[in-house]
């Protein structure tokens, strides 16, 4: 499974409702992640620009996007972002592919690389 960071904030209305009835936000995130075929690995409250950070394991990008859209459609969140996390091993593989891609790339206005149109 792939890991995703789900980051964002609550609206003023959502904060007001949670103050009146705190509930269990971790259980709510666990439930939505499970419904999309994933699982919640970690959940943190934060302060500053964002109010929470959830680390979710999901089988694929589509499942992670489904979680993000499901919670985003509630109207209780602001500045919701879902970020695909890359392990150090995956990062090494990305850099290896980037090396080959860089050799084939021609920036705008530059002469195209040999054999590439």
Model-predicted regions and their roles:
Residues 1-117:
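A compositional/biophysical signature of low hydrophobicity enriched in polar/charged and small residues
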């Amino acid at each position: 499974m792939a890991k995703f960071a789900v980051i964002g904030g609550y609206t003023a209305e959502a904060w007001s409702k949670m103050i009146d009835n705190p509930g269990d936000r971790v259980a709510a995130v666990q439930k939505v992640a499970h419904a999309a075929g994933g699982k919640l690995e970690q959940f943190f409250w934060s302060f500053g620009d964002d109010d929470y950070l959830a680390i979710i394991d999901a089988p694929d990008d589509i499942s992670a996007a489904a979680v993000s859209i499901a919670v985003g459609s509630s109207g209780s969140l602001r500045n919701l972002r879902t970020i695909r996390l890359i392990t150090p091993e995956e990062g090494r593989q990305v850099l290896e592919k980037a090396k080959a891609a860089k050799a084939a790339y021609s920036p705008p206005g530059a002469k195209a690389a040999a054999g590439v149109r």
